């Protein structure tokens, strides 16, 4: 009997702009993470309830359609899955950043692809983002 292959960790991308979601997914496919795409915070939360134990990172836009935005999602994720790497992004976050829970990384748009890949690699390896928070 062969050994079971270890299940790859997952990253969830939450972005309502289909082109930007596709671009982010294509970029993160360079990491060793499987990608799950969602267009709303509600869809991401539903996904997390199903496969949250396999997810190591969520990358979410702040401004999303629906009842929840990316900050609301970050608060829910931080409460339910505190170990998870959570990144939010926006070109215009307004006053929503003041409501981010501790440990959530904010990356302003336009972000640098290399920064996303560095965060993904740290998440995949289970490393802290504290050093990145100081520089991003």
Predicted regions and their residues:
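Non-catalytic signal-transmission and effector/linker regions of two-component phosphorelay proteins
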Residues: 1-12, 18, 25, 49, ...
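Two-component/phosphorelay signaling modules centered on CheY-like receiver
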Residues: 18-37
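Acidic, metal-coordinating helix/loop segments flanking the phosphotransfer/catalytic sites
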Residues: 37-57, 97
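Acidic catalytic/metal-coordinating carboxylates
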Residues: 40, 68-73
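Two-component signal transduction core modules
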Residues: 58, 106-107
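Active-site residues of response regulator receiver
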Residues: 61-62
């Amino acid at each position: 009997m062969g050994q079971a292959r270890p299940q790859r960790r997952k990253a969830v991308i939450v972005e309502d702009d289909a082109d930007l979601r596709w671009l982010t997914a294509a970029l993160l496919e360079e990491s060793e993470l499987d990608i799950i795409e969602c267009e709303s915070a509600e869809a991401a939360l539903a996904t997390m309830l199903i496969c949250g134990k396999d997810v190591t990172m969520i990358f979410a836009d702040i401004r999303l359609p629906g009842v929840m935005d990316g900050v609301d999602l970050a608060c829910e994720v931080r409460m339910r899955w505190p170990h998870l790497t959570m990144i939010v992004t926006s070109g215009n976050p307004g006053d929503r950043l003041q409501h981010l829970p501790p440990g959530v990384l904010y990356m302003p748009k336009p972000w640098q692809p290399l920064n996303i890949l560095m965060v993904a690699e740290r998440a995949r390896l289970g490393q802290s983002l504290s050093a990145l928070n100081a520089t991003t």
